Every structure is written in C-alpha cells, then in structure tokens.
Amino acid sequence: MSKLGVLLTICLLLFPITALPVDGDQPADRPVERMQDNISSEQHPFFEKRAARCCTYHGSCLKEKCRRKYCCGR
C-alpha cells in the first residue's frame, strides 16, 4: 500500500488538482466580466470594415458601378 501512496503523492505533485479547469473559470460562464472587457468588432483592430459587395454569388455583375469592381473580373 505504501508504493501506491508514493505513486499518488508523486502524481499529485507533478499534476496538482488545482491545475484542472473548473466550469466557473470558463469565460463563457462569466458574461459580466466579458462585457467589462469592452472589446467589440467596431473597436477591435483585428476586425476590418468591409464594403458591401454588389457582385452576385457567381461573380456576374448586374449594375454598371459594380462592373468596375475587382470582384467581377474586369
């Protein structure tokens, strides 16, 4: 039994139980703290503003001003 105790002690020292994530520690469970971060897509530099595209799914353009855009292949 002492070998099992030594093994358990070594395992707990190498990987303590406190290192395991608890459900309450997840950011998705704390919406109030997420809202206090105040990071939104309007202010965050990683999100760029994209202009509305007037091209259709297949790349064909129906409007004259859209034909001048790069997405139409002209």
Swiss-Prot record:
MF GO annotations: acetylcholine receptor inhibitor activity; ion channel inhibitor activity; toxin activity
Keywords: Acetylcholine receptor inhibiting toxin, Amidation, Cleavage on pair of basic residues, Disulfide bond, Ion channel impairing toxin, Neurotoxin, Postsynaptic neurotoxin, Secreted, Signal, Toxin
Subcellular location: Secreted
Signal peptide residues on this chain, from the entry's feature table: 1-19
Record propeptide residues: 20-50
Domain comment as written in the entry: The cysteine framework is III (CC-C-C-CC).
Entry protein name: Psi-conotoxin PrIIIE
